[in-house]
Amino acid sequence: MEQKQEKFSTIGYIAAALGMCIGTGNVWRFPRICAANGGGAFILAWTIAMLVFAVPLLSTEMAIGKKARLGCIGSFRDFGGKKYTWMGFFVAAVCFFLMSYYCVLQGYCLKYAVKSVASFETNLTTDTTAAIWTSFTDSPAQVIFFHAIGFALACFIVYQGIAGGIEKFCKVAIPALFAILVGLAIYAVTLKGADQGLQYLFTIKKEYILSPNTWIQAFIQAAWSTGAGWGFIITYSNYVGEDEDVPTSCLIMGLGDNLGAILSGLVVIPAICALSATPEAATEALSQGNFGLTFIYIYQLFTTIPGGRFISFIFFGLLAIAAITSLFSMIEVGVKCVVDMGVARKKAVVAVCFAGFVVGCFSAWSLNNIDNQDWVWGLGLLISGAFIAILAIKYGVEKIRTEEVNAKGAEIHLPKWYFNTCMCIMPVLVVVMVGYWLLQTREWFPDTWLNPFIIQDNTGTVLLQFGVVIVVGLVLGKFFNCKTAKGRITKEENCR
């Protein structure tokens, strides 16, 4: 039975998309990755990655979703033919595994929001806040508890639907998040010692700008924070009107993501420098870029300022809200694929959320596990981006640009030289980056770099996890082709 298709308003669509962009990918991930990769050098590389990777990819995804009116699996089937269906499954699977560990991050934020109210202390040292962080993350029961709460909240809102749940929530949450980030950034940069952080953040160091690692991390961050390659823009674009301006919407997403990321950097990095005992200690903390950077240093910052309890609650509460707005899109990617196969939407929401919670318990068990998942599926995002580019090449890059991206009503037109060049070189660029990154693991783990059964950031674990997803996609390809509903451009021969 055909199910009623909900629609976003233009403002609601942009708010929901920004909800994905301005989540923990900016507030939690950007500062630590930026700090670990040289600050200013990383910002330059990341800006270039946004232009040559994220914006063209977001535009392509939006065009595909608007045209096909199906999820990732159906869109790949209809745009590329039935031999491309497994690629659509890979994109959806990458998003699912990202969702599974992403909710663990949301649980971290919920924990600190609760702690800010229930057991807030003043004038803590870095050692004390580091001990609090370690005590929490070393307790799987606590982490899984907050992980469960996070999924329950996200499931409840997505269950309400597109306009009644996701759009309504994001239109309030995103402006509030921007407001608190601006206020915290102003405060952080006025702290004594914050100038070292500003210098670190905006100084371009030669050794970092020439490092391939900086560029690879920049491209991963561009994908991670904008949602390029996740498949969520393909999914959300099912719910926009025919006259939605693709280039303008994607430009707003990119600029909003950039602003959110820079504001987050201005909050976290100057605060670390201001709160560290010595400049050397600050530099060491920044260069490590560990998972707890925000939860150790920003929490300590709040314990030292007037009204810290309230501000801490607001910050971590809004960070949890940012995370949950990102979760909406990840859940919706899986839900749309399941709904396309004839399952009722509300049943699909519950099934996807429950499966995500179960899989996410692996990441909740230890920091080592979540680091492994961040490593594997961060690379998976680049592969997903390459698959979307390959799909565009198969369908016709120029055809997508003229008929779908620069369609009638578009206020901004993406130039042929820019869009076509970026999309055509993207698969090669991804192969080079991922290949280099995987070969680097031979130096990091010379004895175990190909061992898939060790939880570390090595090549073996990537090949195993990618391999399982690809094999499942190939084996179930015919099932997906037959079971997935027909869209607006479906050809009968692709459904068998």
Summary of predicted features, one role per range:
Residues 5, 34-60, 142-143, 381-384, ...:
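Extracellular loop-to-transmembrane helix junctions
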Residues 335, 342-353, 376-462, 491-496:
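C-terminal membrane-solvent junction of multi-pass transporters and transport-like membrane proteins
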Residues 12-47, 234, 248-251, 255-258, ...:
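Transmembrane helix-boundary motif of multi-pass solute transporters/channels
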Residues 2-7, 11, 167, 171-328, ...:
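Membrane-embedded translocation segments of transport machinery
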Residues 33-37, 63, 79, 83-99, ...:
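Membrane-water interface regions at transmembrane-helix termini and the short interhelical loops
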Residues 57, 102-124, 178-204, 273-274, ...:
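Hydrophobic alpha-helical segments and their helix-loop junctions in multi-pass secondary transporters
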Residues 1-28, 57-62, 66-78, 85-89, ...:
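Membrane-interface "cap" regions at the ends of multi-pass membrane proteins
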Residues 3-5, 32-37, 67, 72-90, ...:
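Inter-helical loop and helix-membrane interface segments of multi-pass membrane transporters/permeases
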